[in-house]
Design a protein with these regions (language model features):
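Canonical Radical SAM [4Fe-4S] cluster-binding loop centered on the CxxxCxxC motif
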Residues: 80-81, 85-121
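Radical SAM enzyme core and accessory elements
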Residues: 1-37, 41, 324-332, 341-472
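Conserved C-terminal portion of the radical SAM core fold
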Residues: 141, 195, 200, 221-285, ...
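Short glycine-enriched, charge-decorated loop/helix-capping segments at active-site entrances
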Residues: 211-217, 288-292, 358
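Generic structural signal for well-ordered alpha-helices
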Residues: 88, 126, 154-161, 185, ...
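Core AdoMet radical
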Residues: 107-124, 128-231, 236-246, 268-275, ...
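An N-cap/entry alpha-helix motif that binds or orients negatively charged groups
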Residues: 36, 40, 44-84
Length: 472
């Protein structure tokens, strides 16, 4: 039976409720008055239920789809403006004991070189990332209790935060590791992580078990209930997501929204971020083996309806996606992207030869961080390297309250401009710097509070004189 507040996976992600939702959406896909009423409801920026969102996703009337896209753009601008947060993944180890059939890290893969970074190698990786201009990382590691124990992750976090090369600093470390215990989540919280990220992969239990035949990750309930344990352990910023293409997109879309609803109903705060990766080629993995892979157009629609349904959440895409797709979804709801990414272990300090490739997936957008920043500036976006909310205690329900009331821009806009100024001074090419300075000049006029604007102007001047790390 469906129970949004249950702590049991098969009740808050209830199979029958998903089937009933899909049946409802299919039955009403041509019910124009109902769909229009839902678009009007969504325009109030209070979100939609999983059932309502499923109907919008099912709608294929061109005029209504364009209305959905326009609304997604408006909601994204209302909550997140034209700011795009930048981050990079850092792969610590690809040792893994699981048997996930879609991931090249699976235990039976004998062709991929296995690597685990030492603390000195992590130091070199972080310096390389700092020299690009990154301030925010997402740590990635395979699940292997012997090679990648929690103590290794904690030591790695301490190492990363300790490194300050030239003007560089990693100010926020998000962590994407396997489902673990409440006690281990407490340890991660004490280590100062930002967001704990864990993708469900697919919400269909039968599909999940078929895709994860061996290893600790094969336990559907333990994996699905991980975010509950993380929040019990004191982590109030969590990031969820599915790997679209493993199961039918309709099923996983509904499951994703039900998970967000469960977290909000149970803990008073929904997911800090929602990621929307798609299955893509990798070592010994072919997308031809996954018949549920989705088109670019459907991917864009999923992003748009997710933004409408969960207006407060940050939305993330990686360099799995091409430049063209990333451009479209930035307008439709995405608020965070990676840039200059390497998905191999140790790939920043010493790029690998193809025959030694330890990547988790093939990268589609291979541009440097400076090229991505320049591109965002050309599109009128503000590339933001801000990590202030985490360091000022604006996390969990405090952060969400500010976002939902539309007040987060009072902090985010000046912080984005100040961190962009740092990037331009320390790392940008001359062409990117020129464009960025012009955009900062224009965007300063859009800060409505004259007191905040005056402080930001003074801080920008001091950044130009060599000072760093101002924040509201």
């Amino acid at each position: 039976m469906y129970n949004i507040k249950s702590r049991q996976a098969e009740e808050f992600i209830n199979h029958q409720e998903i089937l009933d939702t899909l049946e409802y959406a299919q039955a009403n896909r041509n019910n124009r008055p109902l769909i229009e009423s839902l678009i009007d409801k969504a325009a109030l920026c209070q979100g939609l239920s999983h059932r309502e969102a499923a109907l919008l996703l099912e709608c294929d009337e061109p005029e209504l789809v364009q209305r959905i896209y326009r609304l997604a753009r408006e909601i994204k601008r209302k909550f997140y403006g034209n700011r795009i947060v930048m981050f990079a993944p850092l792969y610590l180890s690809n040792y893994c004991v699981n048997g996930c059939v879609y991931c090249p890290y699976h235990a039976k893969n004998r062709t991929i070189p296995r690597k685990k970074l030492s603390q000195e190698e992590i130091r070199r990786e972080v310096i390389a990332l700092q020299d690009m201009g990154h301030k925010r990382l997402a740590l990635e590691a395979g699940e292997d209790p012997r090679n990648n124990p929690i103590d290794y992750i904690l030591e790695s976090i301490r190492t990363i935060y300790s490194i300050h090369h030239k003007n560089g600093a990693i100010r926020r470390v998000n962590v994407n590791i396997a489902a673990t215990t409440v006690e281990n989540y407490r340890l991660l919280k004490e280590a100062g992580i930002g967001t704990y990220i864990l993708f469900q992969e697919t919400y269909g239990k039968e599909h999940y078990e078929a895709l994860h035949p061996t290893g600790p990750k094969s336990n559907y309930a333990y994996h699905t209930e991980a975010m509950d344990r993380a929040m019990e352990g004191g982590i109030d910023d969590v990031g969820i997501g599915v790997l679209f293409g493993l199961n039918t997109y309709r099923y996983d879309f509904v499951g994703l929204l039900m998970h967000a609803e469960h977290l909000e109903a149970t803990f008073g705060v929904g997911p800090h971020t929602i990621s929307v990766p798609r299955i893509c080629p990798a070592d010994d993995i072919s997308t031809e083996d996954f018949p549920d892979a989705i088109s670019d157009e459907m991917f864009c629609r999923i992003v748009a309806v997710t933004r409408i349904a969960v207006p407060y959440t940050g939305m993330i895409i990686s360099t799995r996606e091409s430049e063209a797709v990333r451009r479209r979804v930035l307008e439709l709801g995405v608020s965070q992207i990676s840039g200059g990414s390497r998905t191999s272990v140790g790939g920043y300090a010493v790029p690998e030869a193809k025959e030694e490739d330890s990547s988790q997936f093939d990268v589609s957008d291979r541009r440097t961080l400076d090229e991505v920043v320049s591109w965002l500036l050309d599109l009128g976006h503000i590339p933001s390297f801000c990590t202030a909310c985490y360091r000022e205690g604006r996390t969990g329900d405090r952060f969400m309250s500010l976002v939902k009331r539309g007040q987060i821009a009072n902090c985010c806009q000046p912080n984005a401009l100040m961190t962009l100024k740092e990037y331009l001074e320390d790392y940008a090419s001359s062409e990117t710097k020129e464009k960025g300075i012009q955009l900062i000049r224009e965007e300063m006029e859009h800060i409505p509070n004259p007191k905040i604007r005056a402080i930001a102007e003074r801080n920008l001047q001091e950044i130009g004189e060599g000072k760093r790390d101002f924040r509201f």
